[in-house]
Regions:
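Hydrophobic h-region of N-terminal signal peptides that target proteins for export
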Residues: 11-19
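Short, polar loop/linker segments at the starts of domains and inter-domain junctions
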Residues: 41-60, 310-314, 438-452
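Active-site-proximal helices and loops of the catalytic beta/alpha 8
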Residues: 116, 120, 193-290, 294-297, ...
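Substrate-binding/active-site clefts of carbohydrate-active enzymes
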Residues: 21-29, 34-202, 217-243, 264-265
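Short acidic/histidine-rich active-site segments
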Residues: 334-339
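Sec-dependent signal peptide recognition
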Residues: 2-10
Length: 468
């Protein structure tokens, strides 16, 4: 019996070490969801009014029941909301009151354990959102916060008024949320004990780290070492060097510089803006090999949906989404995009998915299904990337020497001509579009692609799977 227990523990440690490895995470694609808004186990739930800023009934049990929906799109990792106890009304779960108790609105201990086991049984990684910067809005009465229940655990109240002042950013309150005093050894040690406890108790595979610049880098370095699994941090900033400075303290970050470039390109209807990222910002992230680990996204819970701006169309969302899947990095897709949600700034972008239905025949659901299937089949994460040609109305790039992606903003058909010579050429052979298998070409010194209002990804014809 002892030998069996030892073997079981050894296997568990192997699984944990594999999931903690950045080289494994770069192979994954992440579906971000807000637990309170994705799925509910309540029968006949009421319509969710997002502007009431309260719980709508989403829970871990409901999420587990909808794993088929997520896996059907090809996602093999989920990012879920923080699970710790929060101030009442904090449906987003970013306002902690007890670091060692669960948010009862999301379910029981058994529910979260069951969800994680169900995910692991399907080879879906679980990424938990965690907050180590602040606690709930309690003013200066910390008696109800566990374990940080004393004024000495916090910085003196002040507001962040200058985001270029790192001392202010690290020591003052974000939105009046009490700011934990990491230089207090007991506070930092307790936070490190807590994250180690969470990782081990729930067998987590990765962490999404909230409010990264608001916490000193020296703490994140310790956090990284103690938690022992992949972390991806929120550095809400468009400056590539500023974002890159958090690589090392944490495993990775979300690619906010690219997010802003994508938004600008589609807002201004000018895809040459993407060249600025490729030629000026991407080389910064290439230093140290971080580009393949960056989270590539076009929306999240903090920003208005892609379709909120009236100039943008569903076809453009299809283009941007396919771009994010085939670009260099880890695709991170925000729940509801597959149903073309168009909510405005927070809280408008936090719709309840059950109010709209879990349709698996929407065009973007199918784009995800096909795109993520081929991303994995072709092992895209090991392929280099090169920008091939661009203009205001189109953009083309390759991955390796056998994957060509083209997007277009043209109102009518446009011919995209690609010079296929030199070191980075597409290798010889017949290529077909993964989204329309009879759309093919034979590689030559010049490749011409006719673009309609749909993204195109060409791969060798012998790699096409008729089931996808």
């Amino acid at each position: 019996m002892k030998d069996i227990l030892k073997l079981s523990l050894f296997c568990s440690l192997i699984i944990l070490s594999i999931s903690a490895d950045a080289s494994e995470w770069k192979k994954r694609s992440i579906y971000q969801l807000m637990t309170d808004r994705f799925a509910t186990s309540i029968e006949n739930p009421p319509t969710c009014d997002v502007f009431k800023n309260n719980y709508c009934g989403g829970d871990h049990k409901g999420l587990e029941q909808k794993l088929d929906y997520i896996q059907g799109m090809g996602f093999d990792a989920i990012w879920i909301s923080p699970i710790v106890k929060n101030a009442e009304g904090s449906y987003h779960s970013y306002h902690t009151t007890d670091f060692y108790a669960l948010n009862e609105h999301f379910g029981t201990e058994e529910d979260i354990q069951s969800l994680i086991k169900a995910c692991h049984d399907r080879d879906i990684y679980v990424m938990l959102d965690v907050v180590a910067n602040h606690v709930a809005l309690v003013g200066n009465d910390f008696s109800g916060i566990n374990p940080f229940n004393s004024p000495e655990h916090y910085h003196e109240p002040c507001a962040i008024t200058d985001w270029a002042n790192y001392v202010m950013v690290e020591n003052c309150r974000l939105a009046d949320l009490p700011d934990l005093k990491h230089e207090n050894n007991w506070v930092s040690d307790e936070l490190l004990r807590w994250i180690k406890y969470m990782v081990e108790k729930y067998h987590l595979d990765g962490l999404r780290v909230d409010t990264v610049p608001e916490v000193p880098k020296w703490f994140w370095t310790k956090f990284n070492r103690v938690c022992g699994i992949f972390q991806i941090g929120e550095v809400f900033n468009g400056d590539e060097r500023y974002v890159h400075s958090y690589h090392g303290p944490l495993t990775s970050t979300f690619n906010y510089p690219l997010y802003f470039h994508i938004g600008d390109a589609f807002r201004d209807r000018d895809l040459t803006i993407l060249n600025d990222y490729y030629s000026r910002q991407k080389p910064v992230f290439d230093d140290g090999g971080y580009s393949p680990l960056l989270g590539v996204f076009i929306g999240n819970h903090d920003n208005a949906r892609f379709l909120y701006e009236g100039q943008r169309t569903k076809e453009q969302l299809d283009m941007a989404s396919v771009f994010s899947i085939f670009w260099e990095g880890i695709p991170v897709i925000y729940y509801g995009d597959e149903q073309y949600f168009s909510g405005g700034p927070d809280p408008g972008c936090r719709e309840a998915l059950w109010d709209y239905g879990y349709k698996t025949d929407s065009p973007l659901y199918i784009y995800y299904k096909k795109g993520l299937y081929y991303r994995k089949k072709l092992e895209l994460w090991d392929k280099d990337i090169e920008q091939l040609t661009f203009a205001k109305e189109y953009y083309a790039f390759r991955r390796g020497n056998d994957v060509l992606t083209v997007i277009s903003l043209a109102e009518n058909n446009v011919q995209v001509t690609i010079n296929n010579e030199g070191k980075g050429k597409i290798k010889d052979g017949k290529y077909c579009n993964i989204f329309k298998h009879d759309d093919c070409f034979d590689s030559a010194e010049t490749i011409t692609v006719s673009m309609e209002k749909a993204p195109k990804v060409y791969i060798p014809s012998d790699k096409i799977d008729n089931d996808y």
